């Protein structure tokens, strides 16, 4: 198993500076990670730096709260793709989901899917804020709206990915839709356990340490 190809090498901190982004890019190219996941302001820089490599540029939309309008998320998506993004990790409207406004949630995801063209869309459901029934519904609505992946977490709320959430999400979406575990992998063993549970992508800021079998303290 090539664990590196499961990893979205991630740097989403507000205080990220260019030297840190450069390190992220260098590590991603060296270890041939699936993607780098960065804030939208870094997309064009990363896209230019990764030309000629297989590493994708992933960015975030409606991040981290999911509480912007569908129109705003669609604009963010189009702008990110114009700047060179290959993959979009969007946050669904969590409040609308919790109050049972399911059509609004589906329409919100669909707005991003339609704006994304042929680019990959991952829907962050922020599982730590949801009941199991809400997690199932969030996954079902994401699939109905045409998403390619469901993702556990932003890394900016009360918790990251858990094995039980990944299993539940995989059971809900079936074998054809991707599942991304984010914010919970602290070791190679963790990453392998998430993959065993059904994850097809791992979002982490510690990809290098994970593939080298080193322990990770803190971080995303």
Curated annotation (Swiss-Prot):
Keywords on record: Cytoplasm, Lyase, Schiff base
UniProt-listed SUPFAM superfamilies: Aldolase (SSF51569)
Top EC class of this enzyme: lyase
Catalytic activity: 2-deoxy-D-ribose 5-phosphate = D-glyceraldehyde 3-phosphate + acetaldehyde
Record localization: Cytoplasm
Family, similarity comment: Belongs to the DeoC/FbaB aldolase family. DeoC type 1 subfamily.
Protein name (record): Deoxyribose-phosphate aldolase
Species whose genome carries this gene: Streptococcus uberis (strain ATCC BAA-854 / 0140J)
């Amino acid at each position: 198993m090539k664990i590196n190809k499961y990893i979205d090498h991630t740097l989403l901190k507000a205080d990220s500076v260019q030297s840190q982004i450069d390190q992220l890019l260098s590590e991603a190219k060296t270890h041939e990670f699936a993607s780098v996941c960065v804030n939208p302001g870094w997309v064009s820089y990363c896209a230019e730096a990764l030309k000629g490599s297989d590493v994708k540029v992933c960015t975030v939309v409606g991040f981290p709260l999911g509480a912007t309008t569908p129109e705003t998320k669609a604009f963010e998506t189009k702008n990110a793709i114009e700047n060179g993004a290959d993959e979009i990790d969007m946050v669904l409207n969590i409040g609308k989901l919790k109050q049972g406004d399911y059509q609004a949630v589906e329409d919100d995801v669909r707005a991003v899917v339609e704006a994304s063209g042929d680019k990959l869309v991952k829907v962050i459901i922020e599982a730590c804020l949801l009941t199991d029934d809400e997690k199932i519904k969030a996954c079902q609505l994401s699939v109905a709206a045409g998403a390619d992946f469901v993702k556990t977490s932003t890394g900016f709320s009360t918790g990251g990915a858990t094995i039980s959430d990944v299993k539940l999400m995989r059971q809900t979406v079936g074998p054809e839709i991707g599942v991304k575990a984010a914010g919970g992998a602290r070791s190679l063993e963790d990453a392998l356990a998430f993959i065993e549970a059904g994850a097809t992508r791992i979002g982490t800021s510690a990809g290098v340490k994970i593939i080298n079998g080193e322990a990770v303290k803190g971080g995303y």
